[in-house]
């Protein structure tokens, strides 16, 4: 069963979502799956901020405005701005996933980032397993200090993505891989 969920999980962007609302208790169940990610030293560095309803719409508008105000003119893209403004239109919930950096200096930051990434993957596999739609976005100001300030995060924390969750009526596209496994794996016996 998990094999097919992994192979069938697809990115479904908010524009492909139909605007139907996922019950909050289902979102909580999906976040509980995320909580079971592997992590070094039991630091559990993943944190989630969940937006829904009017608060999600407001966040998307404010994120777009922050993008406009903090992006140099030569890098600003009107399409990106419009996508940020309208991202909530089809989504049910928006989840900001970030790494809460622990105080243990023996745990490298990279391990904490990997743990949060694993938590996001758990969330997305749960989404796929329930026949829901999900999109892990790293666009806009995800990697910018301005978003961290907006969210009230600490300097050492790191936003790893905005996950849009919803429902889609569109059939899933067939998955494909471009690079053969023989080029990705080296066996030493």
Spans of features found by a protein language model:
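N-terminal amphipathic, basic helical "cap/leader" segment at the start of enzyme domains
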Residues: 1-90, 189
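Small-aliphatic-rich amphipathic alpha-helix that forms the alpha element of a beta-alpha
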Residues: 34, 101-149
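Generic preference for hydrophobic
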Residues: 48-50, 95, 184-185
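Beta-hairpin (beta-strand-turn-beta-strand) motif
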Residues: 53, 98-102
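Active-site-flanking beta-strand signature of metal-NTP-handling nucleotidyl enzymes
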Residues: 94-98, 163
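Short, electropositive alpha-helical surface patch
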Residues: 147-160
């Amino acid at each position: 069963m998990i094999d097919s969920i992994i192979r069938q999980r697809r990115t479904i962007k908010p524009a492909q979502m139909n605007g139907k609302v996922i019950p909050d208790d289902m979102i909580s169940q999906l976040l509980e799956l995320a909580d079971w990610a592997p992590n070094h030293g039991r630091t559990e560095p993943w944190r989630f901020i969940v937006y829904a309803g009017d608060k999600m719409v407001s966040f998307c508008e404010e994120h777009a405005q922050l993008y406009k105000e903090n992006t140099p003119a030569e890098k600003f893209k009107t399409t990106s701005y419009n996508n940020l403004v309208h991202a909530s239109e089809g989504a049910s919930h928006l989840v900001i996933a970030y790494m809460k950096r622990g105080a243990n200096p023996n745990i490298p930051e990279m391990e904490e980032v990997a743990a949060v990434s694993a938590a996001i993957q758990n969330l997305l596999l749960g989404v796929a397993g329930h026949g829901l739609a999900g999109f892990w976005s790293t666009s806009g100001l995800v990697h910018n200090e301005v978003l961290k300030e907006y969210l009230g995060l600490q300097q050492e924390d790191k936003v790893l993505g905005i996950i849009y969750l919803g429902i889609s009526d569109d059939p899933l596209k067939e998955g494909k891989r471009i690079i053969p496994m023989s080029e990705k794996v080296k066996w030493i016996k």
